[in-house]
Structures are given as C-alpha cells and as structure tokens.
UniProtKB/Swiss-Prot annotation:
The gene is yjcZ. It is found in: Membrane. Belongs to the SscA family. The keyword Lipoprotein does not apply. The chain crosses the membrane at residues 29-49. This is Sporulation protein YjcZ. It is a single-pass membrane protein.
Amino acid sequence: MGFGYGFGGGYGGGCYGGYAGGYGGGYGSTFVLLVVLFILLIIVGASFF
C-alpha cells in the first residue's frame, strides 16, 4: 500500500509528491524515494532524447 501510494504520487505529483507519499507510508520510505528518483531520471532522459 505504501509502495503503491509513493509510486503513484511520485509519478503524478513529481518529486514532492513522491517524497511525501514515501514518507507518509513509512514502509520502506527510502526504497520508495530511490525508485521515484530513478523513474524521474528515466522520464527526464526520455524527454531529452
């Protein structure tokens, strides 16, 4: 539940949404934050290329 919320929040709301979702869930918040940052990195890379 926490992972799904952090994942959806990060993808929809951006960096702040992903951080708030992962921290609010509290279940593996660090892992969720890393996954969100990795996804954002892929999105930025895809937009450039």
